[in-house]
Every structure is written in C-alpha cells, then in structure tokens.
Amino acid sequence: MFQYEKDGPAIYRQSFATIRAEADLAGLPADVSQVAVRMIHACGMVDLVRDIDFTPGMVAGARRALRSGAPILCDVAMVASGVTRKRLPADNEVICTLSDPSVPDLAAKLGTTRSAAAMELWRDRMEGAVVAVGNAPTALFRLLEMIEEGAPRPAAVIGVPVGFVGAAESKDALADHPSGLEHLVVRGRRGGSAIAAAALNAIASEEE
C-alpha cells in the first residue's frame, strides 16, 4: 500500500504552503502574490515568479470588472474549460470564439492564424472585459493591433501564451504597450492555458 495524502483540501493547503515557503514572493503586492501562488501551483515551477510582470492596478481592476458582470474572453477552449465557474462573482460569461464556423474562412481572408482571426469576433464584447490569452502569441499580437485600431479596451489582460515563436515577443509587446493596459504577463517562453486559467480563478475569488 502506498502512503499518500488523499484529502483534497489538505493537498491544496500543503501545496500552497510549500509554494509560499519556496517562492520569493516578497516583492509582490498581496493581491498579485495570491495570483502568483495559483499560477505556480498550475505549473510546478516556483521560479516562475521571477518572470511575472504586472501593472499595479491589474488584479483590483479585473476583480471590479468581474464583480460588475464583465465577460471573460479566452483565446482557446483549454483556458475557458479551466475556469472554475463557482468562483465567478457574477456568473460571468466565459467566451471562446476559436471554434466559430466563420473563423477558418476569416483566417484565410486575413492571411493569419485562426487564433488571431478569432479575435475579430470579440469586438462587440471587449469593452471592460477580462481577457486571457494562454496559448497563441498571434492572438495577443492581434488583440494589441485591434486596440491600436480603435477597438474597445478590455479592463484587464492576462497574457501568458507559451512557445518558441512569438510568445516572449507578444508578452513584451503587451507589457510595454503605450496604451497602458492593465496586464499580467509571464515574460519569456513559459506560459500556457493552465497558467492562464489559474490566474483567472485566483482573480475571480480571493478564497483559496
């Protein structure tokens, strides 16, 4: 017989305690620290904290938006599926347009990826929304382009696409964007849908 922890809440408590003991969270505000713990929990890498970049008002702004009923816009279904609905403060709508039937033709017309083309279907929902990009750098680049073109501004953007082509650059573009968007990013190549969903869940509710 194997001896291992079987109690779910106890596993969470021990995991979060380990993260707080091993990760250098001292330089983070309390609200960002809570989100960082969840992000680290999703990937198992305590050094992720070194690459987390954020605007000071990001977490508070995103929480206000969610409490007011703002939708959550996700680049891929994996991010949307990772959102724990019971944590949402206003039964917020979670939207992913990547599987919309119009997206393949739109991508061909625009000469871009489906992930980037799917952003075009966000336009009427972007104002004051909470955006989470966890997979496709092209989606994050296109989001920034749309804002530069005059599209409505979201309340906050979680930008954590993962990969070797464009991921680091897209997150740098968000973090350094002159529009001053409220954002949370993981600089460099690391990121992913699980980290994006973890950040959303931590922002949605202050309860661990």
Which residue ranges define each predicted feature?
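A short, well-structured juxtamembrane/interface segment
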Residues: R50-A65
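Charged, compositionally biased N-terminal leader segments and the immediate start
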Residues: M1-A30
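Short glycine/serine/threonine-rich phosphate/pyrophosphate-binding segments
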Residues: V79-G82, T138-L143, F164-A168, G192-A196
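Buried hydrophobic positions in well-ordered alpha/beta secondary-structure cores of metabolic enzymes
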Residues: D75, I158-G159, A199
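N-terminal glycine-rich anion-binding loops that anchor highly charged ligand groups
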Residues: G27-H41
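Long, charge-dense
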Residues: L88-M126
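Feature captures the catalytic cores and cofactor-binding loops of soluble hydro-lyases/lyases
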Residues: R125, A139-V157, G166-E169, L174-D176
